[in-house]
Amino acid sequence: MVYGLNVKPEHGYYVKVNPLDGDISRIEVVDQTPDGGLSFINGMRGASTMGRAVKLAFVPTRMQWADRNRHPIPDFASSWILNVSTRAKNLIEEFEPRVHQFLPVDYCNIDGLALESRWFLIVCNRIDSVDRNHSRMRLAKGVMWTSTDVENPKLVFSEEQARGYHLWRDKHLIHGPFISDILADRIQMEGLTGFYGTRADSV
């Protein structure tokens, strides 16, 4: 089974987060070799969602978690760039060691006091995981799955194509990332916060 790795606010509202250094608009993907999928987008949040490692030059190393109610940061958070706690990092690396890019980032609270050392998570599996025979979607220009002009659209993942992967980006989809049911189950069993897994259709 396949799940979308979504992030939810733990206390009913999204917290404003401010980069304190770096320049997210200038972050670039390291290897931009075409692979038949989506073109590689640099800057803002694009580079961090392409399924390949990013250059470190402009990645922030300090962020402010501006929660006036002073709640802790969940294990999974999506502010600017998907970021995780050390607990979440260790669990992911238990399944896929030395695969993904974990970039250290220090968070402070609204008063500027140290809050937590965390990790930007750059997913580094970029695969084609959609089942073409069972999906009712259009592969626009042979590059991106879209439901535009499709009657009763349906996206179905291939368990065969995703076999052996636990965390990935699909090279033909603008959303994601996606995770295996095994990893989703462990995240929930360990009680990691901020995670909201949505089960996707798969065959």
Regions found by a protein language model. Name each.
Residues 1-203:
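Phosphate/anion-contacting hairpin/loop surfaces
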